[in-house]
Design a protein with these regions (language model features):
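Terminal catalytic/cofactor-binding subdomain
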Residues: 1-149, 155, 180, 194, ...
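Active-site scaffold segments
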Residues: 79, 158-162, 297
Length: 417
């Protein structure tokens, strides 16, 4: 056996401790980041999928990292993702990401392509354009539970909001309560920003992207249980999840044995001993709505049109990073958690703000967030964009998906005429 591999062999006890500590790094609150995924289309050939080489050529001359600290990656289906640098504040994150997005947009348009807002590409069949051992193994793993995984991997786009885990106190800036609040607000955030209308399973959905994700392997896509010890629960969740990728350095297939969990592997049930690298790769494949990665990663939000990605980043920050606002927001969303678990998330994906009480709660949370953003010193233009979004959609019980659906109806009527 390779000597380096032996040195890095991992026990179940070591893995449990690592996942628990790495998931929630305790510290002060205030840093903000975002990851913006964009669908990419050639307007002259809207049903085609730009090849990876064309995408690489489009961004080849951009610096890495970008001036604002962001980095560009190509996703499995040819989506482009901008991962922002870590801002010391919301204002810094938004300013830097706007500057980086301007460079990315200009480069893409100069190549004859277009970045599209929206959570799901409903026009093109799901097709993976990147051929890497990891993505090939993930696709084989997802295929075991149905076709949804390919669609999510290749045709979806989201806004991910990244905030500090929180400190080690028991207050609303402590990681225990922040984890609870992030989960409790999650279905509401999903409903507010739903932007991928479609039909699946005989139902119409506001966020088809998210319901397809929930239809994948439940052990890696559904929310962990809410307990008094989030570190312990996250370690349990991660080790109970099935392994989707087993890396190899000799060119062998990376496909994981069917049914193998991380705990099974740590107990000797895998094709070889598990290492810290394997564990980190496994953690990176888990996609619950809120994922602890040393910070909190909000993953339930569909991509928005234009610069409206700013709104979820600001809303989540305003509700989470001001202690007064966080405590009041908790009281608003607490009654929405009557059933908990998967039902709340699926209902939000299907009905958006049509669920009884959700519009009122969301509107109240927007008002709270604006107060919190003011106390956090957020610039006026960010607060105005948040307020405008709320007036256009939330207070009317609408979400961006309703606009998309209405445009499709008008287009269908025009064609029929």
């Amino acid at each position: 056996m390779n000597a380096v591999l032996i040195q890095n062999m991992l026990s179940e006890k070591e893995a449990t401790a690592y996942v628990a500590s790495a998931g929630f790094r305790a510290g002060s609150v205030g840093s903000v980041g975002t990851e913006l995924e964009w669908l990419v289309r050639d307007p002259s050939a809207p049903l085609s999928r730009p090849a990876p080489d064309r995408l690489r050529d489009a961004v080849r001359d951009l610096p890495d990292p970008l001036p604002g600290g962001g980095r560009i990656t190509i996703e499995p289906g040819g989506q482009l993702e901008l991962s922002s640098g870590v801002g010391a504040s919301l204002a810094e994150c938004v300013a830097n990401t706007r500057a980086d997005m301007a460079l990315l947009t200009a480069a893409v348009e100069a190549a004859g392509l277009r970045l599209e807002g929206g959570g799901l590409d409903m026009l093109r069949p799901a097709f993976r354009v990147l051929d890497t051992p990891r993505y090939e193994a993930l696709e084989r793993f997802n295929d075991r539970s149905g076709p949804e995984g390919r669609v999510v991997a290749c045709n979806s786009a989201s806004v991910q909001v990244c905030l500090d885990s929180g400190d080690d106190t028991d207050g609303w800036l402590g990681y225990r309560r922040r984890w609870w609040l992030a989960d409790a607000m999650g279905p509401m955030l999903l409903a507010i920003f739903a932007n991928s209308p479609g039909t699946a399973g005989g139902h119409r959905w506001r966020s088809t992207r998210q319901v397809l994700r929930f239809a994948m392997d439940a052990g890696r896509t559904r929310a962990p249980r809410m307990t008094d010890d989030p570190r312990k629960e996250w370690a349990r969740y991660a080790l109970a999840a099935k392994v989707s990728v087993v890396a190899s350095e000799d060119g062998a297939d990376w496909t994981a044995p069917e049914g193998l969990t991380m705990r099974d592997w740590l107990r000797g049930g895998g094709p070889r001993p598990a290492t810290y690298i394997d564990l980190e790769m496994h953690l990176g494949t888990l996609v619950p709505p809120v994922r602890p990665r040393g910070y909190l990663e909000f993953r339930m939000i569909d991509q928005q049109d234009g610069e409206n990605w700013v709104v979820p980043v600001a809303l989540v920050t305003g509700l989470m990073d001001d202690a007064v606002t966080a405590e009041r927001a908790a009281e608003i969303v607490r009654p929405l958690r009557s059933l908990r678990r998967n039902h709340d998330w699926v209902t939000a994906a299907r009905r958006g703000l049509g669920e009884p009480g959700l519009t009122e709660a969301a509107t109240a949370c927007f008002d709270l967030a604006l107060e919190g953003l003011d106390r956090l010193g957020a610039p006026a233009d960010i607060r105005e964009r948040v307020a405008d979004f709320a007036q256009r959609y939330t207070v009317r019980g609408r979400c961006p998906a309703d606009d998309v659906a209405a445009r499709r109806v008008r287009a269908a009527v025009a064609v029929a005429a």
